[in-house]
């Protein structure tokens, strides 16, 4: 069966952060990550690692956090009354990568574990996470490869896992006020505890370890593509959607800001440069128009 082992999860997460940072440094070939360790007065802390102004990545942030408290914040117990009066531990790795070249997609990934304890009662625990891709220029082969990687890592856990978490990702990363998805999706899962602990932990590890396997080939393929001012302007405009989603809809961002989380780490996902343009509409027949017409809506990318 396997009892929840928070220390084992923490060790994996810290190693995952190190592995992903090393992999991104190899891909960039120029810049390295700066490390910022921090403590939380209420308990716990984290390690924020940020790469800026690299050859490939304009900014990449990879954050590890492990926070704890004697009681759950009211915002967390509102829809989970069984957590009231329990101490808690929450830990995770989250990352957002903003490349320089507009032909490389922006990406986000996150894996996390939560456990709440109470004397004389079984612990309440769950895993969450996923990864998603936000291209600026449409390459269907990249998107298919991304989703194939996601499907492959899900396969050992059951045929229903990929379609379930792929659909959840499409629904979660959606901007209602724009009527479009933030990108082309991937995987999103939360409240994962319906398998025994060891299997749930194995799945979280598969998602965490599978992220670079899915992303690195796309970076390698696109990083030397020539681009000009037009592509850069469109990239900066589309980055605005990232800001809109994270500040208006993202549960993790809102929870962190509402519960006194570390602002610098929470807002590490923001792109370093972004632009808005009133009533922008892409010119018909352009790659920019194709992104809007074909890519920013949920679909089965692996259909024959």
Curated annotation (Swiss-Prot):
Catalytic function, reaction form: coproporphyrinogen III + O2 + 2 H(+) = protoporphyrinogen IX + 2 CO2 + 2 H2O
The protein's annotated pathway: Porphyrin-containing compound metabolism; protoporphyrin-IX biosynthesis; protoporphyrinogen-IX from coproporphyrinogen-III (O2 route): step 1/1
Annotated site location: Important for dimerization: 177
Subcellular location: Cytoplasm
Residues the entry annotates as binding a divalent metal cation: 98, 108, 147, 177
Enzyme kind, highest EC tier: oxidoreductase
TM annotation in the entry: none
Main location: cytoplasm
Active site (catalytic residues): 108 (proton donor)
Annotated GO CC locations: cytoplasm
Region described as Important for dimerization: 242-277
Stored Pfam families: Coprogen_oxidas
Gene Ontology MF terms in the entry: coproporphyrinogen oxidase activity; metal ion binding; protein homodimerization activity
Keyword entries, A-Z: Cytoplasm, Heme biosynthesis, Metal-binding, Oxidoreductase, Porphyrin biosynthesis
SUBUNIT field: Homodimer.
Function of the protein: Involved in the heme biosynthesis. Catalyzes the aerobic oxidative decarboxylation of propionate groups of rings A and B of coproporphyrinogen-III to yield the vinyl groups in protoporphyrinogen-IX.
Protein name: Oxygen-dependent coproporphyrinogen-III oxidase
Organism: Shewanella amazonensis (strain ATCC BAA-1098 / SB2B)
Organism ancestry: Bacteria, Pseudomonadati, Pseudomonadota, Gammaproteobacteria, Alteromonadales
């Amino acid at each position: 069966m396997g009892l929840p082992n928070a220390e084992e999860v923490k060790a994996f997460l810290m190693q995952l952060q190190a592995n992903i940072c090393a992999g991104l440094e190899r891909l960039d070939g120029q810049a390295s990550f700066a490390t910022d360790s921090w403590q939380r007065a209420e308990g716990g802390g984290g390690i924020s690692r940020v790469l800026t102004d690299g050859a490939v990545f304009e900014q990449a942030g990879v954050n590890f956090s492990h926070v704890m408290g004697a009681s759950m914040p009211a915002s967390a117990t509102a829809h989970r009354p069984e957590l009231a009066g329990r101490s808690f531990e929450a830990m995770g790795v989250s990352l957002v990568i903003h490349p320089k070249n507009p032909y490389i997609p922006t990406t986000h990934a996150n894996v996390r574990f939560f456990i709440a304890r109470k004397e004389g009662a079984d612990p309440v625990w769950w895993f969450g996470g996923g990864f998603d891709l936000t291209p600026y220029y449409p390459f269907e082969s990249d998107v298919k490869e991304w989703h194939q990687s996601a499907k492959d890592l899900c396969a050992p856990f059951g045929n229903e896992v990929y379609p379930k978490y792929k659909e959840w990702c499409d629904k979660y990363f959606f901007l209602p006020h724009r009527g479009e998805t933030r990108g082309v999706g991937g995987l999103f899962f939360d409240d994962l505890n319906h398998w025994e602990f060891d299997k749930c932990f194995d799945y979280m590890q598969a998602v965490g370890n599978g992220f670079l396997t899915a992303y690195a080939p796309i970076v390698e393929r696109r990083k030397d593509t020539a681009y000009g001012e037009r592509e850069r302007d469109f990239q900066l405009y589309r980055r605005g959607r990232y800001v809109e989603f994270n500040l208006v809809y993202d549960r993790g961002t809102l929870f962190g800001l509402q519960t006194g989380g570390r602002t610098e780490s929470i807002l590490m996902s923001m792109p370093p440069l972004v632009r808005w343009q009133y009533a922008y509409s892409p010119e018909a027949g352009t790659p920019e128009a194709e992104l809007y017409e074909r890519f920013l809506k949920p679909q089965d990318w692996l259909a024959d």
